[in-house]
């Protein structure tokens, strides 16, 4: 099991290019077949565009399970339904699984 602590990319996560850059920065440290968890602790804000880019790249890379750890972060809770509605793929499935546990 691997945990990605998003706080290592900053407290304010904005823009599609920054999301892509964040994923590219950690790709070489990840094992694609292992469970990957995403931790939102200490992140103040994440925009749908940043998270869409990051999670899309992660979902495409991973052959295992990707899960989102529970959070009370309002920006995360607002961004996720937007992404889940806009997509019909592995990213939407990851988000729907998280939202069903709320």
Residue positions per predicted region:
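STAS-like cytosolic regulatory interaction modules
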Residues: 1-44, 56-102
């Amino acid at each position: 099991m691997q945990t990605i602590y998003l706080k290592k990319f900053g407290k304010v996560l904005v823009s599609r290019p920054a999301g892509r850059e964040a994923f590219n920065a950690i790709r070489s440290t990840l094992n694609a077949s292992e469970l990957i968890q995403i931790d939102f602790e200490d992140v103040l804000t994440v925009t749908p565009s940043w998270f869409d880019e990051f999670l899309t790249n992660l979902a495409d890379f991973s052959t295992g399970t990707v899960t989102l750890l529970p959070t009370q972060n309002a920006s995360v809770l607002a961004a996720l339904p937007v992404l889940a509605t806009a997509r019909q793929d592995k990213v939407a499935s990851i988000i729907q699984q998280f939202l069903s546990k709320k």
